[in-house]
């Protein structure tokens, strides 16, 4: 038995003293996981989150400038000149407009604005406005200073309320030609008194007609006299209208009563984001590339999930919580069946720390110590592919589609519902496309890495040939001595197998001879043990018979 133990120890020592080279991957303590088409929560050495999820919670400037914050006013209150919005009359510039949900200063005198949503969209799409006078007071030969308690005993800054003067209201006929070289937004209104008495007190007659014409429009209006529900202390109403006077066009207004006449107009210039945010967010001293009603964000990632109403230089919105792209290897310490390529050779338990130059590499041990090096060729190819993957995803998702918070009036509620459903469906499709694209890329990445490690392992295996033996753990035990220079030739593909073939053959025969001697010794010991055991049993049985016969416990009869 002592001989057997000695041989076993010799074999272990022989194996442990062999020079060795292993193929492995960069070691990490990563807890990152990604999803693929076939697996969820696959551990990986490195992953990149493609989804931006944070915002600063503030209203910020964008590349187009600062926002116009209306505070207590609405956009229509600004356009028509609500007297409570006087601070905004000096003109302004904006990249987007902020309207507070609690804004109360809109149309102070009750009534409806025709095509209000289109007007708000037109105004907000510009980046600046300038107020200009189009019909001066001196053009009227009636009173032009009508006011209302509903408007703080004042009236709109962009229109004049024309009423009778000295119990007379002759036909008013005014013209304005746009020589400004830019389009002018102008507004007017028609008053609908609650009673005939109020009508005649204001305009001396009940049957009046107003016409407003340009090269593009030809509108005629008559008042609808009658009481309405009390709003802002008024039973009367004003219907509000607007139009755009293009350069060179002429506006003509004719009326013998009930006219709220144009006074000032707006020259709209430039182009903004065209967005109206209804939010109570505070304005911050910040500049962002992308703004939402929840806050601003800056990111280089291709996707975000902050708000579908984002605008600016924004990544694509997808309504998911995470989109992780695998940019490294499977972080699996033990060999197992993975991916499309089966068992992956070269995955060393725990990986190697220090292989910082890349994913794939070699570790060796010889008389000079232990060394480690990355395989720069395969690593660089992998890095190049990873670098291009994010760009490919961005390119594949670069079709521009912005969800705009469309405004519809109450009569268009059904249209609004349909629009929202369409927007939601499109967003769901984008999210599905993004997730599917990332799943496909992750599957491809991990399978490519599996193949790369396998190829590197097989490359070394082919180079070494019979000069080494696989240990089953991603390593090769060499039958010859291999210094650091020799190890480098294995790594860079210049290994000369014939140079070490004779030394390897002798070492292999030596090891195989030890194995044969060991096997012969085992056979001899086995035979000896069997014979000895049989003799001991036979002698024991004979002694038992002798003892039994001597004391009469056993008798032997021989019959002939």
Region spans (language model):
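Extracellular/luminal domains of secretory-pathway glycoproteins
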Residues: 2-560
């Amino acid at each position: 038995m002592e001989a057997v133990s000695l041989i076993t120890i010799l074999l272990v020592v022989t194996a442990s003293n062999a020079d060795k080279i292993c193929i492995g991957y960069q070691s990490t303590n990563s807890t990152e996981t990604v999803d693929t088409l076939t697996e969820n929560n696959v551990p990986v050495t490195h992953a990149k989150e493609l989804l931006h999820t944070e915002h600063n919670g503030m209203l910020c400037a964008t590349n187009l400038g600062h926002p116009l914050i209306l505070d207590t006013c609405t956009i229509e209150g600004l356009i028509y000149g609500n007297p409570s919005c006087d601070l905004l009359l000096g003109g302004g510039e904006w990249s987007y407009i902020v309207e507070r949900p609690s804004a109360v200063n809109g149309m102070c005198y009750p009534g409806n604005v025709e095509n209000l949503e289109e007007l708000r969209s037109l105004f907000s799409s510009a980046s600046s406005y300038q107020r200009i006078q189009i019909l001066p007071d001196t053009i009227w030969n009636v009173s032009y200073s009508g006011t209302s308690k509903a408007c703080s005993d004042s009236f709109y800054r962009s229109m004049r309320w024309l009423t009778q003067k000295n119990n007379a209201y002759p036909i008013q006929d005014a013209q304005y030609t746009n020589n400004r070289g830019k389009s002018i937004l102008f507004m007017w209104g028609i008053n609908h008194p609650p009673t005939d008495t109020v009508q005649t007190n204001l305009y001396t007659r009940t049957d009046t007609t107003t016409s407003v014409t340009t090269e593009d429009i030809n509108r005629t209006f008559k008042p609808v006299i009658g009481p309405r529900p009390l709003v802002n202390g008024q039973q009367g109403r004003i219907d509000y209208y607007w139009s755009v006077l293009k350069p060179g066009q002429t506006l003509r207004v004719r009326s013998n009563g009930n006219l709220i006449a144009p006074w000032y107009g707006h020259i709209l210039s430039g182009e903004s984001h065209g967005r109206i945010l209804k939010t109570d967010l505070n304005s911050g001293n910040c500049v962002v590339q992308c703004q939402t009603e929840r806050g601003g964000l800056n990111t280089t990632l291709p996707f975000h999930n902050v708000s579908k109403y984002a605008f600016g230089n924004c990544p694509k919105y997808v309504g998911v919580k995470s989109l992780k792209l695998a940019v490294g290897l499977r972080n699996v310490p033990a060999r197992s069946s993975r991916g499309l390529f089966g068992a992956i050779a070269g995955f060393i338990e725990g990986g190697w720390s220090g292989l910082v130059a890349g994913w794939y590499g070699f570790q060796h041990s010889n008389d000079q110590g232990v060394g480690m090096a990355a395989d720069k060729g395969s690593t660089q190819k992998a890095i190049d592919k990873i670098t291009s993957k994010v760009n490919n995803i961005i390119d594949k998702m670069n079709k521009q589609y912005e969800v705009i918070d469309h405004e519809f009036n109450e009569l268009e509620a059904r249209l609004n519902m349909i629009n929202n459903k369409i927007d939601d469906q499109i967003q769901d499709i984008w999210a599905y496309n993004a997730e599917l694209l990332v799943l496909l890329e992750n599957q491809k990445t991990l399978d490519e890495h599996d193949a790369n490690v396998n190829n590197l392992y097989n490359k070394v295996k082919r180079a070494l040939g019979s000069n080494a033996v696989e240990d089953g753990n991603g390593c090769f035990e060499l039958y010859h001595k291999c210094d650091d220079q020799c190890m480098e030739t294995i790594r860079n593909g210049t290994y000369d197998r014939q140079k070490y073939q004779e030394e390897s053959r002798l070492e292999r025969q030596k090891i195989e001879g030890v194995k044969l001697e060991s096997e012969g010794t085992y056979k001899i010991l086995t035979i000896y043990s069997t014979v000895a055991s049989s003799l001991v049993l036979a002698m024991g049985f004979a002694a038992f018979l002798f003892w039994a016969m001597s004391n009469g416990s056993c008798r032997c009869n021989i019959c002939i």
